[in-house]
Amino acid sequence: MILFSSNIFVMKLLKIDIDRWEEILITITRNKTRSFLTAFGVFWGIFMLICLMGGSQGIQDMMSSNFEGFATNSGFTGSNQTSKAYKGFRKGRYWSLEIKDVERIRRALPEIEILTPSNARWGVKATYDKHESSSCSMKGVYPEYAQIETPTLTIGRFINHIDVKERRKVCVIGKQIYETLFPDGSNPCGQFINVNGIYYQVIGVNTSAGNMSVNGWPPTTITIPFSTMQQNYNFGNQIQLLSYTARPGHSIKNIQERIEPILKQAHMIHPEDKQAVMNVNAEALFGMVDNLFKGIKILSWMVGLGTLLAGAIGVSNIMMVTVKERTTEIGIRRAIGAKPLDIMSQILSESMVLTTVAGMLGISFAVFVLQMMEIGTAQSDTPAHFQISFWMAIGACIILLVLGMLAGLAPAYRAMAIKPIEAIRDE
């Protein structure tokens, strides 16, 4: 008996729900054009929001791929022509960094984590067998340099301390050089390539494709031990560039401010010469890029939410018109016993259904567009992920529900305020 009564109750409840949803559908489709235009505002708002967020993430990925493997807390210092005369030295003097400067800076600045010198040559030509790769660059480095500009080694290894100590004629070649000299895709390790008349044994292939680099683009760069570079190309004690990273809690800007006076004092440069010492603060550049994308994301949220809010206001206005048109219907319901909360629930349900359905369609279409954009960039050298996170999608759904409820509040309260007698008299 109890089971039978429970079944009857469930059937009644289902019937009530079916009736309510049927009524919502009839109300929304009563004026199809108006409902479509109202829903389109919400659809476009959520579509813009998702596309802007996913698009900004994709662009950020593309930009980040250009900095791939580059230390974000790094800085670089080199020499430049002087702009002031000092202690008998004329203005416009050229000077060079020296090996001694490395030890001077290392002793004076313990906040530097990695400090390594490097030299470079441009316009070199590499040949192997009958194949030739021209317009290459050559870079002499220490093993520590890999912590500043991390190579992507798919074959072989990088320069090590034994290579530097023994002045070995070994090299790591870039991806483009490898593809030109070894078009059959064979393993180049152990093979000797001719670089401007000097033979070097290949020990690795660097396939890094990042567009941010120092002293040469990775795909067209031949990397050799620093000591070999000094010996083979008569650099002596000269250094073209000092590369360094800061320990946690220290900034590159402060380090560079302390490096300058050390170098100026050692090389007889005027203390107020702003040109003689050349500094590049990669940490500041990365910070600017991060701030740029933070600003883009904030702007995307503002534009997307603003458009979505405009759509929700449109829903609210249309629901107000709908309530006005249904004044008599609502009055009759009140007269035959409908509670104010029932009327309010009905209006809110209609508003939320209209908003949610339009919003879900907008999310689906936006995800489809982002997927097409990702497929379109998949074959490029800088692939990007034009996607939104799971939690962003959940957040968008919650925003839709909240806006749908808020859009229906004013019309719902107006419907609750309708008195049966006045509604019938209004008709």
Language-model regions: role of each:
Residues 28, 412-427:
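Short cytosolic juxtamembrane segments of multi-pass membrane proteins
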Residues 66, 270-304:
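Peri-transmembrane interface segments
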Residues 57-137, 144-147, 179-180, 230-231, ...:
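Hydrophobic, regular-secondary-structure patches
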Residues 12-14, 83-91, 212-214, 268-274, ...:
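Short helix-coil transition/hinge motifs at the ends and kinks of transmembrane helices
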Residues 20-29, 33-41, 48, 52-53, ...:
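Transmembrane alpha-helical interface segments in multi-pass membrane proteins
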Residues 2-22:
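Short, membrane-interfacial amphipathic segments enriched in basic
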Residues 139, 144-159, 169-270:
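Mid-to-C-terminal secondary-structure elements
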